[in-house]
C-alpha cells in the first residue's frame, strides 16, 4: 500500500498556491548541500577543527529574498554556531522552518520542525531520526527530497517567500503520523491542534544572544500548518510524557503535537 499525505505550512497566516509541473531548469545544477561538509583545504585547517572548518550553510528551499528557509534537520538545537544540517550526519530528524544566517556563527531562532513517521509513534527528535542516503537526496534551491529509510517515507518540499508545501508518501501499511514541535532550547513556546480547521498552530519565542544573553527578544516565530487528510488520533507531548487527546500544550522542554492519519488502500493526497 502506498499513501500520500500533503501538508501546507503557512507562516504569518499567508497562503500559497499549489506548485505546478516541474520543468527542466538550471536549478538542478545547484547543490545546496555545498558548505555543509568540513573543508579539507590547508587554509581551512589553519583556523581549527570545529565550526571554523564548515561553511555553515544549509540545503534550504526558498524564493529569492524569502522570509524563511526550509531545510532538513539533523541537529536538534538553535544553539549558537550550530547549523540545522551537516553532511556528515546520518539521520534526519525532520524538516525545519529556519532563520539561520548562512555563513555565520550566530544562532537559529523562532524555528519549528515537522517530521513524518510510521509504525510506532516516536516523537522526540533524538528518537524519531531516520537513516538516509545522500544518493537518495535531491537538494536544489526550489526542491528538496529524501527517502526516510527507517519509515519507507519519501519526503518532498518546496518553498515560497513565507510558506512551504510538503508531500510525504508513506510506502508501508502502517500508522502514519505527523510530528510538529517548536524548537526552543529555553523550554518556551506553545502549540495547539484545531481539528475543525485542520490546522496546527503555535509559536517559538526568540531569545537574545550576546548583549542580554538568554533574555526574551520581544517577538516570536509563529507558524500554522494545514493538513488535508482525516485524522484518527491526535495529542501533545512534553519530553517523555505523551498526552493522547490533548489539543494544546505550552512551555516546557521538548513540547510538541502529533497527528495520526487515516490510511486507505488507495492512494490519497
Positions of predicted regions on the chain:
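Bacterial N-terminal signal peptides
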Residues: 6-16
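Accessory carbohydrate-recognition regions in carbohydrate-active enzymes
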Residues: 22-269
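Bacterial Sec-dependent signal peptides at the C-terminal "C-region" and cleavage site
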Residues: 14-24
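Positively charged n-region of N-terminal signal peptides that target proteins for export
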Residues: 1-4
